Amino acid sequence: MAEIRNYTMNFGPQHPAAHGVLRLVLELDGEVIQRADPHIGLLHRATEKLAEYKTYIQSVPYMDRLDYVSMMANEHAYVMAIEKLLQLEVPIRAQYIRVMFDEITRILNHLLWLGAHALDVGAMTVFLYAFRDREDLMDAYESVSGARMHAAYYRPGGVYRDLPDSMPQYKASKIHDEKTTKARNENRQGSLLDFIEDFTNRFPTYVDEYETLLTDNRIWKQRLVGIGTVSPERAMALGFTGPMLRGSGVEWDLRKKQPYEVYDQLDFDIPVGVNGDCYDRYLVRIEEFRQSNRIIRQCVDWLRKNPGPVITDNHKVAPPSRVNMKQNMEELIHHFKLFTEGFHVPPGETYAAVEHPKGEFGIYLISDGANMPYRMKIRAPGFAHLAALDEMSRGHMIADVVAIIGTQDIVFGEIDR
């Protein structure tokens, strides 16, 4: 009699639902998954090693490219680690700007997650809506840094520059006539803060639109409820953080439990799931949209009323203004040294973590007193989540793996590093 064997199948890395370069080796009994083995490393770029040969400031753009949909949140952990070693005081205005952009980044990340997750499961409309709404936030990125994605806006000691007083305007073209262009420029007449405030007024309506399309949708619930269930104890044992941990009912958020910057002065809530399945994690992230919106509004109000410096006045770390540089020899020397040699960080080691859109993103930095790190270790939240994919997908169908990869919000830049 013929022996019945399990069937081995490769899922990805060319599969559209594999989120980049994920290769899964699935062991199947019929269509039921017995084992899922993620193969990683296809996007390994040696970021940790490269950082050892770059000055501290030169590594900031590398951070953007780790989780390349949560750019500024990555930078934040890195500059916080440097500030801890240097014992730098960050101006309060810079702290508010950072928090505001961290939350803008959270919305950017969750919009991409929602669009991709829905598209994987088969809902096309949400994907188009989400990308329509990301556009405004990308413009906010562009107005402060000149780049829509890889901003390199945070600096040790503050941020690169203050918020601009005017927004870039659309110009009429063959595709968009004068009338359409005028309508598109309507909310761009004021400063960046006016533009962001206008977005925060509109955004709750957008979130309601997503909920109308998905939350009570029968197909959506059939594909998500009871899939990839993780108990609170297992979630903690597996090293889950962020929405993956909160979806299992554990109220852990670094913004509340280990506050950094000005989070302890802001009013917001931590959404927590009940069942620990894909649907609960969806609901947690949807509520995070609303809470991030609340935080951004509070930051906008504060930033309007409180002008001030946005980067430290210690010219050993931050460059002097161009006006001073052209009038004073000492400032010119500071400027020259900063951009040739960089600044030296006292010997020591530190760990700085932020509540990244995907979980706890941490940077462990060791300095030997030179102008480059002796060692930099990146603690990527997605790495622990992907490691649990095997446990989460056992006993489910192949189609459910797609929903589980979606709910984990996998981005390979940070996993392979």
From Swiss-Prot:
Keyword Cell inner membrane in record: yes
Leader sequence segment: none
Location relative to the cell: Cell inner membrane
Primary site of residence: membrane
Xref: SUPFAM superfamilies: HydB/Nqo4-like
Pfam families: Complex1_49kDa (PF00346)
The protein's Enzyme Commission number: 7.1.1.-
Keyword Cell inner membrane annotated: yes
Its membrane topology: Peripheral membrane protein
Keyword list, A-Z: Cell inner membrane, Cell membrane, Membrane, NAD, Quinone, Translocase, Transport, Ubiquinone
Classification via PROSITE patterns: COMPLEX1_49K (PS00535)
GO terms assigned for molecular function: NAD binding; NADH:ubiquinone reductase (non-electrogenic) activity; quinone binding
Annotated InterPro entries: NADH_Q_OxRdtase_suD (IPR001135), NADH_UbQ_OxRdtase_49kDa_CS (IPR014029), NDH1_su_D/H (IPR022885), NiFe-Hase_large (IPR029014)
Catalytic activity: a quinone + NADH + 5 H(+)(in) = a quinol + NAD(+) + 4 H(+)(out)
Assigned GO CC terms: plasma membrane
Role: NDH-1 shuttles electrons from NADH, via FMN and iron-sulfur (Fe-S) centers, to quinones in the respiratory chain. The immediate electron acceptor for the enzyme in this species is believed to be ubiquinone. Couples the redox reaction to proton translocation (for every two electrons transferred, four hydrogen ions are translocated across the cytoplasmic membrane), and thus conserves the redox energy in a proton gradient.
Subunit comment: NDH-1 is composed of 14 different subunits. Subunits NuoB, C, D, E, F, and G constitute the peripheral sector of the complex.
Family of the protein in this entry: Belongs to the complex I 49 kDa subunit family.
NCBIfam families in alphabetical order: NuoD, PRK06075.1
Name listed for the protein in its UniProt record: NADH-quinone oxidoreductase subunit D
